[in-house]
From Swiss-Prot:
Expressed by the venom gland. GO terms for biological process: cytolysis by host of symbiont cells; defense response to Gram-negative bacterium; defense response to Gram-positive bacterium. Insecticidal, cytolytic and antimicrobial peptide. Has insecticidal activity against the flesh fly S.carnaria, and against the cockroach N.cinerea. Has insecticidal activity against D.melanogaster. Has hemolytic activity against human erythrocytes (EC(50)=6 uM). Has cytolytic activity against insect Sf9 cells (EC(50)=1 uM) and human leukocytes (EC(50)=3 uM). This is M-zodatoxin-Lt8a. The lineage of its organism: Eukaryota, Metazoa, Ecdysozoa, Arthropoda, Chelicerata. Keywords: Antibiotic, Antimicrobial, Cytolysis, Hemolysis, Secreted, Signal, Toxin. Residues 1-20 form the signal peptide. One of its GO terms (molecular function) is toxin activity. It comes from Lachesana tarabaevi. Belongs to the cationic peptide 06 (cytoinsectotoxin) family. Cleavage of the propeptide depends on the processing quadruplet motif (XXXR, with at least one of X being E). It comes from the Eukaryota. Residues 21-60 form a propeptide. Both the N-terminus (61-94) and the C-terminus (99-129) of the mature peptide form alpha-helices which probably disrupt target cell membranes. The linker region (95-98) probably derives from a processing quadruplet motif (PQM), found in propeptides of many zodatoxins, hinting at a fusion of two originally separate membrane-active peptides. GO terms for cellular component: extracellular region.
Length: 129
């Protein structure tokens, strides 16, 4: 359970990093404009974008590929967990559970797992009280 939560947190972190864009403030643009003696604000934005382009492409390429690998592995783990939980919870065979999971969308599988682990966490919390 702990590893599953950590893996989901890592996936979310990599997704945020891969899709993040640098914030451009007016102060940064003014500095670029003064350094290059540009009168047009659009030229300053364009120059700043060109300066950061190579670093961003390298970072996004690395995190994008890593993100895809982690996402694929997380999806496989979620499918296996959903089948295992259905077998245990509903008392059906593994083949029947696999057929049910295959019929579900990824969103439905995630919701099913979140409900299951949410109930489990609530039970543990109530036992401690």
């Amino acid at each position: 359970m702990k590893y599953f939560v950590v893996a989901l947190a890592l996936v979310a972190a990599f997704a945020c990093i891969a899709e993040s864009k640098p914030a451009e403030s007016e102060h940064e643009l003014a500095e670029v404009e003064e350094e290059n003696e540009l009168a047009d604000l659009e030229d300053a934005v364009w120059l700043e974008h060109l300066a950061d382009l190579s670093d961003l492409e390298e970072a996004r390429g690395f995190f994008g590929n890593t993100w895809k690998k982690i996402k694929g592995k997380a999806d496989k783990i979620m499918l296996k967990k959903a089948v295992k939980i259905m077998v245990k919870k509903e008392g059906i065979s593994k083949e029947e559970a696999q057929a049910k999971v295959d019929a579900m969308s990824k969103k439905q599988i995630r919701l099913y797992l979140l409900k299951y682990y949410g109930k489990k966490a609530l039970q543990k919390a109530s036992e401690k009280l």
